[in-house]
């Protein structure tokens, strides 16, 4: 596998590799070619690249048309520009007819807006799409998982949203680990005091919290939840059933994302105490690591929240 760094480059490498053997793969760019690190794709496969300019709604409509002809289009740009500006088109012209369009939203989460701040920090995207039927929502944790998530998206029938970041993500997975369609991967099993669930680009911090807690005699299990509102949540429910309580951590608003998904599963299947860690307000500009610490995503802050929930 070629070398890449971060979720954006991972996306570009994935569609290039797929296009080598599948001429149905298309990239529709609403003036996002450079942002998606996909310039090489356009050079290698000019007939599989469509540029709409700064027109997200038009890009989604074009992709819907391509999908209706049997092609597999990917629309990639900033997460908020997709899910907010083009929400109606994603709903009515893709999800309603259940067309095979794939969306990749970059700069998702608080940590994506290091330079731009609130206008380029998108922590509502999963919540928005969670309300639209037929969407599969994939939330890979880092670059390697994004690469495999994009390839997995191409194999899923119907609309798929892949949540990607800014390129500053800390790599947790090696490049060979596939994207599991079970909806969860257990990474540490120290004990059943708490199930510590992560979604997206805070996984490295969640793993640190687990190690800090272990040093204090608190033994948790860590799970990476990589599909939100999975059609078959049986593996997630299995993990939930083995512990006394749950803490969720997500680089997203606590409404509509991982915390809401797990709370719904618990209420309907196995009620138990749940603590949700995520955003409850708008973000701000600043270095990604400092923002993560300030908004409660440090390993120490997560460990403290777990202890308070015991």
Residue ranges and their predicted role:
Residues 1-163, 168-169, 178, 299-301, ...:
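Thiamine diphosphate
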């Amino acid at each position: 596998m070629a070398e890449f760094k971060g979720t954006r480059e991972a996306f570009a490498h994935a569609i290039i590799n797929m296009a080598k053997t599948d001429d149905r793969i298309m990239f529709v760019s609403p003036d996002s070619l450079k942002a998606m690190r996909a310039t090489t794709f356009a050079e290698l496969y000019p007939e599989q690249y469509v540029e709409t300019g700064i027109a997200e709604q038009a890009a989604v409509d074009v992709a819907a048309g391509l999908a209706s002809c049997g092609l597999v289009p990917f629309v990639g740009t900033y997460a908020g520009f997709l899910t907010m500006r083009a929400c109606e088109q994603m709903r009515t012209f893709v999800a309603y007819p259940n067309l095979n369009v794939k969306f990749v939203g970059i700069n998702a989460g608080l940590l994506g807006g290091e330079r731009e701040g609130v206008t380029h920090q998108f922590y509502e995207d999963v919540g928005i799409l969670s309300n639209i039927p037929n969407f599969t929502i994939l939330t890979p944790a880092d670059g390697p998982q994004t690469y495999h998530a994009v390839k997995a998206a191409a194999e899923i029938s119907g609309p798929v949203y892949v949540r990607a970041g800014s390129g500053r993500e800390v790599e947790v997975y090696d490049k060979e680990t596939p994207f599991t369609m079970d909806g969860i991967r257990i990474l540490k099993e120290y004990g059943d005091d708490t199930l510590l669930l992560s979604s997206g680009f805070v996984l490295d911090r969640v793993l640190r919290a687990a190690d800090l807690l272990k040093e204090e005699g608190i033994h948790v299990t860590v799970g990476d939840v990589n599909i939100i509102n999975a059609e078959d949540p049986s593996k997630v429910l299995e993990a939930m059933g083995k512990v006394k309580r749950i803490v969720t951590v997500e680089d997203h608003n606590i409404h509509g994302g991982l915390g809401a998904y797990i709370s719904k599963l618990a209420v309907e299947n196995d009620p138990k105490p749940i603590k949700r860690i995520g955003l409850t307000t708008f973000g701000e500009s600043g270095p990604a690591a400092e923002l993560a610490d300030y908004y409660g995503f440090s390993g120490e802050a997560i460990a403290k929240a777990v202890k308070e929930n015991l």
